[in-house]
Amino acid sequence: MVGENTDRSALLEKLGVDIDPELLELALTHRSYAYENGGIPNNERLEFLGDSILGQAVTVKLFRENPGLDEGELAKRRASLVSSVALAEVARGIGLGEYLLLGRGENQSGGREKASILADTVEAVIGAVYLDAGGDEATALVLRLIGPLLADPDRFGAAMDPKTSLQEAAAHHGAGQPVYTVINTGPDHSKTFHATVDVGGLVTASGEGTSKKQAEMAAALSAWTALTNHRARTPRG
């Protein structure tokens, strides 16, 4: 399996911090892998810790750097930056998926690209850094990870509201309204939603999440990225 046999030194270089090897392995261990290997510990406790650190670091940064924004706008921006959609983009930017330790079924069903798994693992890594190196290092990691989003206003806007951003991009290309199709799989208590969006035949993209809204947002961001990256191929009027 890919995650088991991958040298993690390149990941540490991208993260810009050293992490105890055992803690890093735990941060990368999805519950499906833990279950298939005798119930070893998984990364969910680290995810819980990292979620709190992430929220605090983002809150403080937004508060300090945006003195003119009211509470509602600050909350909206924070929600976008800590969303599964945004964190999954962060994870893809550092190639985190190839390092995940997944069970066979999860791996075969595309778990390395699932937004929810990628986002949860980012939080687990943040938690691992906090335990190994302390709060300052963990906060610094958070700021490095979200830096690319904050430095790119267009991408930040897309992460905040991917469906609106995609609609605007589609209009720019004369493609009409994006059309979404959503299905769900799994038991009632643990459904996974899979969304596909078609943008006037120019782009078709997919996304998944634990809710219909989350899946549509993931698909919209993927489609927005594709349209943005391939503007040169689009006929201009």
Curated annotation (Swiss-Prot):
One of its GO terms (molecular function) is ribonuclease III activity. Digests double-stranded RNA. Involved in the processing of primary rRNA transcript to yield the immediate precursors to the large and small rRNAs (23S and 16S). Processes some mRNAs, and tRNAs when they are encoded in the rRNA operon. Processes pre-crRNA and tracrRNA of type II CRISPR loci if present in the organism. Homodimer. The active site is at 51, 123. CDD domains: DSRM_RNAse_III_family, RIBOc. One of its GO terms (biological process) is mRNA processing. It comes from Leifsonia xyli subsp. xyli (strain CTCB07). GO terms for cellular component: cytoplasm. It comes from the Bacteria. It is found in: Cytoplasm. This is Ribonuclease 3. Residues 8-134 form the RNase III domain. Belongs to the ribonuclease III family. Residues 161-229 form the DRBM domain. Keywords: Cytoplasm, Endonuclease, Hydrolase, Magnesium, Metal-binding, mRNA processing, Nuclease, RNA-binding, rRNA processing, rRNA-binding, tRNA processing. PANTHER family: RIBONUCLEASE 3 (PTHR11207:SF0), RIBONUCLEASE III (PTHR11207). Its EC number is 3.1.26.3. SMART domains: DSRM (SM00358), RIBOc (SM00535). Mg(2+) binds at residues 47, 120, 123. The gene is rnc. It catalyses: Endonucleolytic cleavage to 5'-phosphomonoester. The keyword RNA-binding applies. Its cofactor is Mg(2+).
